Swiss-Prot record:
Protein name stated in the entry: Phosphatidylserine decarboxylase proenzyme
Cofactor(s) in the UniProt record: pyruvate
EC number(s) stated in the UniProt entry for this protein: 4.1.1.65
Subcellular location: Cell membrane
Site (Cleavage (non-hydrolytic)) location in chain: G249, S250
Pfam families: PS_Dcarbxylase
Gene Ontology annotations of biological process type: phosphatidylethanolamine biosynthetic process
Organism whose genome encodes this protein: Acinetobacter baumannii (strain ATCC 17978 / DSM 105126 / CIP 53.77 / LMG 1025 / NCDC KC755 / 5377)
Chief subcellular location: membrane
Recorded GO CC terms: plasma membrane
PTM info: Is synthesized initially as an inactive proenzyme. Formation of the active enzyme involves a self-maturation process in which the active site pyruvoyl group is generated from an internal serine residue via an autocatalytic post-translational modification. Two non-identical subunits are generated from the proenzyme in this reaction, and the pyruvate is formed at the N-terminus of the alpha chain, which is derived from the carboxyl end of the proenzyme.
Lineage: Bacteria, Pseudomonadati, Pseudomonadota, Gammaproteobacteria, Moraxellales
Modified residues (Pyruvic acid (Ser)): S250
Free-text cofactor note: Binds 1 pyruvoyl group covalently per subunit.
InterPro entries referenced in this protein's UniProt entry, alphabetically: PS_Dcarbxylase, PSD-B, PSD_type1_pro
Amino acid sequence: MSFTSRLKKELFIKAQNLVPQHQLSRVVGKVAASENPILKAAVIHAFKTKYGIDLSIAEQGNALKYKSFNDFFTRALKDGVRLVDENPDSIVSPADGAISQIGKITAGEVFQAKGQSFSVEKLIGDPQLAQPFQEGEFATVYLSPRDYHRVHMPFSGTLTETLYVPGELFSVNQVTAENVPGLFARNERMVCLFDTELGRMAVVLVGAMIVAGIETVATGKVKPSGRIELQHHELKLEKGAELGRFYLGSTAIILFEKDKIEWEKRYKAESVVVMGERMGHTL
């Protein structure tokens, strides 16, 4: 790596700690939620152009018909665009995106990037709720700005708890994954816990800088607070059903207990996935 590239990386990481993360995200959130026709049309057009958004696969193909940027960003897809693997033993991708990391949880640690990991206990935010996942399996899926931003069930189960964990809002990308210790266990997140025929399963929705919000089917849009908030539920969700959505980012992490599933061998860091695609199978 050249001196210039290394310097840019170091400055980017330092800036993460200097920027008022939550205040910036709130400002972006207000713009994203605005239904002002001129503002929302301008923002949608700029975003669509920059990221090459393909509206031909969206349920609503006319960008002007969305009531706000948030409405556009969390757009539904046409029926049949994403097919959920119907094999009863399959574990499917919860979202469109790219695999950041995938594999085993070793000594309670989830691999983040070269030289970086974080504890499953810190990720979940509760030692007792995290216990079943020690030595289990994990997959981290990063949703880029151009991706479909709804998160779906990787396997059928009953939602029993949601746990809002307050935190920071670092940007999520390869640079921060490699240089911010415990990135995913430090950012604000919503932990969704399930009972399944395989035992316990978790889907963790992780926020990031300028993420305007996280929403789940059980809690609605999350209202950030400075404390951990645990809610109990009894909601049955089938594989492929919508679980939640991101307003501007960023990452979904799925966890299973030890010796319950196996990931397909072809998947590795940076593998591209689409929602409903078979990523693994039960044992």
